[in-house]
């Protein structure tokens, strides 16, 4: 892919002629400063997605595979490109490695944009048709999609080694110029250069841009529809649960505590009595908040935030690779163009494209808090505190999940409360009573409880603070 050299490395000539060599060494130093962050940053991305459960979703699995491609660029492509620059673009390695190196170069750059295209398509389907997409959400199916992306990339790049190695041991007419520079010669690979640029970049880029704008449009529409349904504002903390009412004929039953005096849930309140007044009957009727609606709004907010981050990744990738592919097609179609100028532009734009492999981890660090925290822990080797916290959270979550699976919607509150006592759930807070129990004295009470979620909603005008004590 490199069709021009920078300048000869001369060390045994007079001082005035050493300037090109000095400039070349500075360029090599800058290139090394690009290679090292590319390798380190993408290793951090792979570790974060592999180890952090919060980051293990379909989009991030694609990003991890993208990081693998970028990591391989830093390990296999950039160092050899640096060597060719140090040797004045003369290929210093065994000649059969030239088509293999060109194959890896095309493969990884193609895989990068194919991953971004697959991410945009997968996210659009997930937002547009969540029910259908949920059927293909398992890790195995995501890995199958990733394998398909790599397979497509391999199929696009495979003509290079096939055509190059087939002409060995006389590959000079295939991948080497008269200066023994390892390149895709336009007279031999003209059709491949045009076809590869269209299939590997311009067509996926067009699809990706269309899908991205459609995704943003769908998200905005869903947010608008969801917000239009929310016409109630709450001025005090709320704990939202899902209750089943008895039939109208059944009289209200008082809540019976179990033998230990523990209730189903407990809450510790710290109330500022100044300026607080008891809510009226109309205000109490607004104290039921839809947990599902709140969760949907949070989900859409997260999707919008993720779309912005991916939009930045898309934009940077396009800005950094578009000049190379435009120049690449120009070199194949423009016969009268100066080969030296085209070659130098190809060399510069190739390295601009390589830089994009090291920028993605920086984008994740700046715009994603979970990635940023994970990177900080990995760099500082701080695993012990994080592991103990995660184990404690996992133990508490699993304990509560086991109890919730035994709660029956047909059992009474007191019977369900005994499950917490049997599991030795202890806390030292005051008993909690549902806000729905204070609605009206004649209202029906609930005998069956389905603990969907306990949701605390805080507003600016509220001075009352509540804390749910689970363990």
From Swiss-Prot:
UniProt motif ([DE]RFG motif) ranges: 187-190
Disulphide-bridged cysteine pairs: 98-182, 334-337
Sites where a glycan is attached: 12, 173, 179
Residue ranges of the motif NPxxY motif: 360-364
Pfam family, one: 7tm_1
Membrane topology according to the record: Multi-pass membrane protein
Protein name: 5-hydroxytryptamine receptor 2B
Xref: InterPro entries: 5HT2B_rcpt (IPR000482), 5HT_rcpt (IPR002231), GPCR_Rhodpsn (IPR000276), GPCR_Rhodpsn_7TM (IPR017452)
GO molecular function: Gq/11-coupled serotonin receptor activity; neurotransmitter receptor activity
Positions occupied by motif DRY motif: 122-124
């Amino acid at each position: 892919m490199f069709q021009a050299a920078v300048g000869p490395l001369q060390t045994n000539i007079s001082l005035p002629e050493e300037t090109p060599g000095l400039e070349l060494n500075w360029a090599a130093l800058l290139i090394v400063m690009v290679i090292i962050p590319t390798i380190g940053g993408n290793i951090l991305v792979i570790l974060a997605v592999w180890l952090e459960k919060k980051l293990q979703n379909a989009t991030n699995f694609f990003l991890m595979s993208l990081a693998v491609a970028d990591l391989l660029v830093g390990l296999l492509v950039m160092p050899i490109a640096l060597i060719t620059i140090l040797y004045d673009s003369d290929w210093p390695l065994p000649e059969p490695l030239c088509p293999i190196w060109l194959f890896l170069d095309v493969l990884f750059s193609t895989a990068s944009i194919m991953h971004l295209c697959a991410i945009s398509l997968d996210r659009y389907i997930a937002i547009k048709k969540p029910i259908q997409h949920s059927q293909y959400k398992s890790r195995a199916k995501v890995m199958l999609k990733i394998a398909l992306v790599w397979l497509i990339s391999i199929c696009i790049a495979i003509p290079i080694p096939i055509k190059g190695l087939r002409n060995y041991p006389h590959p000079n007419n295939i991948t080497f110029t008269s200066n023994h520079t390892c390149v895709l010669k336009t007279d031999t690979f003209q059709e491949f250069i045009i076809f590869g640029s269209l299939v590997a970049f311009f067509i996926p880029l067009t699809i990706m841009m269309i899908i991205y704008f459609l995704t943003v449009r769908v998200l905005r529409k869903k947010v608008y529809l969801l917000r239009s349904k929310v016409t109630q504002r709450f001025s005090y903390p709320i704990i939202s649960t899902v209750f089943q009412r008895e039939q109208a004929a059944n009289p209200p039953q008082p809540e019976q505590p179990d033998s230990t005096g523990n209730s189903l849930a407990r809450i510790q309140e710290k109330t500022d009595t100044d300026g607080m007044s008891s809510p009226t009957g109309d205000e109490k009727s607004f104290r039921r908040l839809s947990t599902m609606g709140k969760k949907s709004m949070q989900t859409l907010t997260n999707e919008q935030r993720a779309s912005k981050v991916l939009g930045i990744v898309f934009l940077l990738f396009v800005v950094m690779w578009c000049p190379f592919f435009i120049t690449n097609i120009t070199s194949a179609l423009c016969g009268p163009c100066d080969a030296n100028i085209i070659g130098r532009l190809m060399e510069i734009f190739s390295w601009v494209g390589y830089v994009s492999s090291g920028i993605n981890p920086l984008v994740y660090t700046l715009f994603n808090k979970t990635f940023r925290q994970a990177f900080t822990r990995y760099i500082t080797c701080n695993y012990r505190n994080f592991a103990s916290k995660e184990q404690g959270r996992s133990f508490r979550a699993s304990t509560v999940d086991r109890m919730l699976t035994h709660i029956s919607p047909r059992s009474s509150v007191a019977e369900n409360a005994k499950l917490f006592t049997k599991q030795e759930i202890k806390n030292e807070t005051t008993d909690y009573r549902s806000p729905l129990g204070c609605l009206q004295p004649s209202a029906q009470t609930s005998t069956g409880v389905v603990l969907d979620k306990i949701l605390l909603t805080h507003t600016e005008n509220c001075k009352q603070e509540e804390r749910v004590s689970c363990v």
